[in-house]
Amino acid sequence: MAKNIGLNVAVPEKDCDDVNCPFHGSLPVRGQVITGKVVSERMQGTVVVERNFLHKVQKYDRYEKRSSKIHAHMAPCLNAKIGDEVKIAECRPLNKTTSYVVVEVIKE
């Protein structure tokens, strides 16, 4: 039985026994909710999500494209592949570089 995590996301159909799963484990989510594209899934249980945004250059009063890469934990009940659009939510630090968890696969 999946629990309500407080976000407007679809609950995954598969069950998992991961303690760091926001739906089936005991990991609370809070803070930022970001959408981005998966660019790497080579780490075990972790994906790299690239987020694109616009940054204003004050001198020229114009915008430039920038991007940042965020490491996010992916539970076994969610199956995201490279190129998928995912929604990630902030959580407590899980390791040195991971403070986000994948909560929904938007577009495959």
Curated annotation (Swiss-Prot):
It holds the Pfam family Ribosomal_S17. One of the primary rRNA binding proteins, it binds specifically to the 5'-end of 16S ribosomal RNA. The keyword Ribonucleoprotein applies. It comes from the Archaea. Coiled coil: none annotated. Gene3D superfamilies: 2.40.50.1000. GO terms for molecular function: rRNA binding; structural constituent of ribosome. It comes from Methanocorpusculum labreanum (strain ATCC 43576 / DSM 4855 / Z). PANTHER family: 40S RIBOSOMAL PROTEIN S11 FAMILY MEMBER (PTHR10744), 40S RIBOSOMAL PROTEIN S11-RELATED (PTHR10744:SF9). GO terms for biological process: translation. This is Small ribosomal subunit protein uS17. SUPFAM superfamilies: Nucleic acid-binding proteins. Part of the 30S ribosomal subunit. CDD domains: Ribosomal_uS17. GO terms for cellular component: cytosolic small ribosomal subunit. Belongs to the universal ribosomal protein uS17 family. Keywords: Ribonucleoprotein, Ribosomal protein, RNA-binding, rRNA-binding.
